[in-house]
Amino acid sequence: MKKIILSFIFLIVGGYGQKYFQQDVAYNIDVKLNDSLHTLSGYEKITYINNSNETLDYLWFHIWPNAYKSDSSALAKQFIRLGNTKFKYTKEKNRGFIDSLDFSIDGIKAGWEYHSQWNDVIKINLPEPLKPKEKILIETPFFVKLPKIISRLGHNGQHYEITQWYPKPAVYDINGWHPMPYLNMGEFYSEFGTFDVKITLPKKYRIMATGDLVGGASEIAWLDSLAKEGDA
């Protein structure tokens, strides 16, 4: 009995002794909307710094647009559990996905594989182990077919709601990796990061988003004109 108690106390003390850390993730994304085909074509660069005390041999990544791909996704199954059939009866042409992924790490091609349960989570095998305090540059093209709005990503005609649309690393923290599928109910546990995003749209569109506009004097003037119309 004493051995069990001592072991339990040791585990608690050991857990409190570990230091908190966050991985450092910086995104650079260039993406273009095709409003005829309802698609996104993009290229992504991610600078990833390993602030943990562990050496990483692989990274878990979320490719959440695949949640809209088939009836076997965690999203589809959640809808069914909740008695919602709108995903089940969505036509194939109105569903979504992400493909054209071709990952490289510091210029070296990296292999990857799907999670055993979820089609919207993948594991990227690193060409070289990522040691503590080291950084890598992750690059990949990507192509997203936007679904008709079923959940938070999609379109209704030429109105677009774009969220969780790019490949992103899962959180790695003091408790290890946190790969998770996209779900309609619940929120997302993601690494804090910085974003530099270039978005190309047909001229008739306007973006409503957070962030700091770079070189957007004409956009600010347009918004000011709308404000004046509203005050009139």
Task: Enumerate the language-model features and the residues they cover.
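Positively charged n-region of N-terminal signal peptides that target proteins for export
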Residues: M1-I4, N94-G96, I105
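Sec-dependent N-terminal signal peptides
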Residues: K3-V13
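N-terminal, polar/Ser/Thr-rich
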Residues: Y16-S41, N156-G157
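Beta-strand-rich interaction surfaces with strong enrichment in secreted/lumenal proteins
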Residues: Q18, I29-K32, I46, G111-E113, ...
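Asparagine-centered strand-capping/turn motif at beta-strand->loop junctions
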Residues: Y48-S52
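Short Pro-Gly-centered flexible turn/kink motifs
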Residues: K131-T140
